[in-house]
């Protein structure tokens, strides 16, 4: 049985370009060592090619039966199947050489190769990502994309218990560091033997390109600094983002903000995110245009979007960077008490920007999303943060991906929405149902609008979740889409 499985996996590696015939014996021997086998008889023929995950699952079952896999938990299985795939994964130098050769053909050819490679090695676990729920909701700002993230497995209590007694390591310093390439991992850090990163240069500095293992959108990539240094939004950030889209014009690139609450989950390591995907924000038009006197070659305006966005367009990268830095500098020190915008309190800064860069034909385009992370007694999680009434759907920070119009919602919603569907169809008292009680007030607000049946309830709930997401983005917007908010936004524009 194990000979058959090893032969299947080697055939998969050959078919998907991970290895060639010269590597076949070498890789086979590596797998034999891993599975503690001293004998091997190559099967005369293999059956119909199977999906990678089916082969890996069978190999894991064999490993479990032999005591090679200690515990049958998701974490332990992931550590071992990554080690298995690491044996098939070419050395970094090989992958980088192919990427460079493909880049000479075109940037798109290079990223297409690298993306398919990252899927073939199982670094991107496509079998899990397809479990994510995804749909679109029409709003006045365009089609919002809503996802329920089901691809990140939850920790097994057995692994949590083991991890609690394990010796802690500071290597790699974080999940983004270049030292992850080839790292074996442990209970609290994923294995990365099948991970390969691509060096790129942005404004003379060394960065690396990789894909997100969770791929929230097409070719979702991460561009991270060679060094473990904190996130920062400044003039060089704008320059680097535009330099990236200049080198990869078919990709967009953006940065999370550099302050807590309005930033992403990793503020400790300088990085950007990008990919081959057109977000709803990119499709949103100018709502109001204005002139920047010092930058006459820049087409500037406010974008029709639930958050407060200034868009800059131009042919000269230097002009856009200078204009963006001017706006950032102004915004960092700007207060407007009439609309609760304070640049700092007790010396703690609150204003920052979430920037997004893209090419629009032969024009550079930079969207600057104004952010403020002030908290109040009534809003301890943030004044410009999802309001309490929407926490049953979304209470987490609004980061870069969501700013652009793609919701990443927690896995708990899948079960809760399924129960909500049944409770509504059964005309239950929603407030008496422990699982859906948190959603009761929200659901009671829209149930009367529809003639609900078992054939439309699912799509109705999806639509209403999408509407909530648009509202959540409005909550995160520093200038509300009211007459008062628009007048306040105008005051800031005039200050430029």
Language-model region placement:
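Active-site microenvironments that recognize anionic phosphate/pyrophosphate groups
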Residues: 1-223, 227-230, 304-306, 321-324, ...
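Helical scaffold of the NTase/Pol beta-like nucleotidyltransferase catalytic core
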Residues: 194-198, 229-253
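Structured alpha-helical segments in the cores of large, soluble enzyme domains
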Residues: 207-212, 237-245, 291-298
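Short amphipathic alpha-helical segments
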Residues: 233-240, 316-319, 323, 461
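Amphipathic alpha-helical segments that form well-ordered structural scaffolds
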Residues: 240-244, 326, 468
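Catalytic or ion-translocation cores adjacent to nucleophile or general acid/base/metal-coordination motifs
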Residues: 245-265, 274-326, 332-335
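Beta-rich nucleic-acid/ligand-interaction surfaces
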Residues: 260-268, 346-352
């Amino acid at each position: 049985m194990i000979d058959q499985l090893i032969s299947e996996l080697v055939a998969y590696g050959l078919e998907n370009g991970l290895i060639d015939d010269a590597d076949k014996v070498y890789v086979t021997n590596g797998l034999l060592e891993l599975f503690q086998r001293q004998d091997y008889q190559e099967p005369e023929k293999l059956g119909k090619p199977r999906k990678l995950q089916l082969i890996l699952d069978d190999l894991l079952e064999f490993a479990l039966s032999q005591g090679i896999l200690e515990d049958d938990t998701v974490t332990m299985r992931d550590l071992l199947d990554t080690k298995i795939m690491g044996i098939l994964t070419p050395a970094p130098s090989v992958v980088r050489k192919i990427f460079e050769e493909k880049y000479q053909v075109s940037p798109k050819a290079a990223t297409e190769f690298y993306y398919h490679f990252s899927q073939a090695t199982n670094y991107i676990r496509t079998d899990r990502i397809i479990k994510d729920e995804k749909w679109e909701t029409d709003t006045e700002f365009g089609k919002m994309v809503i996802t329920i993230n089901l691809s990140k497995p939850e920790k097994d209590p057995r692994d949590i218990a083991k991890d609690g007694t394990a010796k802690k390591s500071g290597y790699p310093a974080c999940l983004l560091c270049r030292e992850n390439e080839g790292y074996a991992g442990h209970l609290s850090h994923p294995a990365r033997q099948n991970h390969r990163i691509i060096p790129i240069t942005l404004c003379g500095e060394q960065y690396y390109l990789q894909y997100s293992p969770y791929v929230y959108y097409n070719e979702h990539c991460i561009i991270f600094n060679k060094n473990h240094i904190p996130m920062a939004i400044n003039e060089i950030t704008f320059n680097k983002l535009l330099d990236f889209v200049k080198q990869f014009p078919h990709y967009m690139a953006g940065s999370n903000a550099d302050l807590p609450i309005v930033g992403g989950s990793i503020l400790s390591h300088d990085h950007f995110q990008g990919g081959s995907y057109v977000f709803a924000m990119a499709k949103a038009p100018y709502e109001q245009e204005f002139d920047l006197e010092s930058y006459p070659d820049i087409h500037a305006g406010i974008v029709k979007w639930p958050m407060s966005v200034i868009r800059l367009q131009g042919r000269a990268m230097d002009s856009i960077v200078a204009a963006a830095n001017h706006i950032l500098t102004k915004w960092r020190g700007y207060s407007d008490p009439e609309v609760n915008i304070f640049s700092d309190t007790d010396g703690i800064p609150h204003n920052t920007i979430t920037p997004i860069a893209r090419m629009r034909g032969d024009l550079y385009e930079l969207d600057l999303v104004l952010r403020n992370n002030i908290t109040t007694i009534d809003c301890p999680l943030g004044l410009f943060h999802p309001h309490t009434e929407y926490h049953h759907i979304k209470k987490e920070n609004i980061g870069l991906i969501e700013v652009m119009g793609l919701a990443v919602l927690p896995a708990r919603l899948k079960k809760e929405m399924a129960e909500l569907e049944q409770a509504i169809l059964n005309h239950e008292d929603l407030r008496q149902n422990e699982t859906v009680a948190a959603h009761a007030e929200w659901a009671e607000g829209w149930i009367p609008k529809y003639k609900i049946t078992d054939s439309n309830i699912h799509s109705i709930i999806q639509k209403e979740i999408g509407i909530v997401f648009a509202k959540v983005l409005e909550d995160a917007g520093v200038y509300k889409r009211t007459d008062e908010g628009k007048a306040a936004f105008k005051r800031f524009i005039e200050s430029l």
